[in-house]
Amino acid sequence: MKKNLTELVFILDRSGSMGGLEQDTIGGFNAMLTRQKEQEGEANVTTILFDHEVQLLHDRFPLKAVAPLTEKDYYVRGCTALLDAIGYGVEKMANIQRHLPESERAEKVIFVITTDGLENASKRFGYEKIRRMIEREKEQYGWEFLFLGANMDAVKEAARFGISSDRAVRFENDTQGVAVNYHVVSETVSRMREAPCCASIGAEWKEQIEADFQKRHHR
């Protein structure tokens, strides 16, 4: 196990319903990367974009070498192949960790999955297969998965593929909501990278996102 090395895997929705929030997403993602670069410790970044297709943007790039996201990288189109994106990411990272020498395997693996809509276009993976894959990596290797979903019951949806309620949150999919999302994700990933054990981070990480959503939907 390589101490102080974290594999960061970002799975970002770029389906058509994200239209109008491209600059917010790009700005939030880049600010998060800047914050992570300032932190001690090594990290590799894998970024997977998805609509009706899955695109690998960053393939375990050293964190400090990752260039800012641009409009050429992130543009919206199509439907939501959420399960295919998750399955691709988990399968890829598991294969890498399995075949690396023990001394080179990351101490921590953290997935951050962000979507503004429910699965509707996957062809390769289904809910049950994804659930088994995620639960295996969580239980055997301590991987962490954060799920941020808009326009849905995010806790209920996350449970369908093996992510517990304390790691799932619903957000408001607008400029303010996206900004809060990336601020909280950056803070949480930083805490997980610093912590002796990611599991020590409780459900409190998502309180700011929940408060933002509830404030705008208070009756």
Whereabouts are the PLM-identified features?
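Acidic, low-complexity intrinsically disordered regions
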Residues: 1-219
